[in-house]
Amino acid sequence: LGTSSYTFHGGEHSRFSHCLGVYEIARQITEIFEEKYPDEWDSSESLLTMTAALLHDLGHGAYSHTFENLFDTNHEAITQDIIQSPDTEIHQVLLQVAPDFPKKVASVIDHTYPNKQVVQLISSQIDADRMDYLLRDSYFTGAFYGQFDLTRILRVIRPVKNGIAFQRNGMHAIEDYVLSRYQMYMQVYFHP
């Protein structure tokens, strides 16, 4: 929320709780993909997806979005450095999964991982990150603009060859999500 919490006083929560929320949405989606779309989803990608969801904002500092342009920093690059640096505990834990696991997680965050399904679940126009922060920010600010039907979106999301897609019968839920995102930016994030 950055400085929006000064206008919306209830709008205070942590990156930690947000990352847990992104992880949970990613977990639900990968579970759905494993159950409903085993031919289109490689279940070995589920752990990577959930790990990237949990760690995606690791490089954020206080007011990070506000100060990134000022100090010419990039939280995603910092996140990748933390994940790939042999000196960090996170790197050491990820190595226990597989020797190349830290590099894979970092490549998801860098959007260079070859499986675009995984990348798009973490970072795209409709992803676990945005779904969580819209609902979370709407709840904590008391602004209802960010509300959308997550349950319906989870019912209609599906893996396709080059990413993720949504079934036509869920288009109203997708339209509602897009409008909710627009309204949150206009009414909360860019509040006059």
List PLM regions with ranges:
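Sequence-structural signature of the catalytic-core scaffold of metal-dependent phosphohydrolases
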Residues: 1-51, 59-192
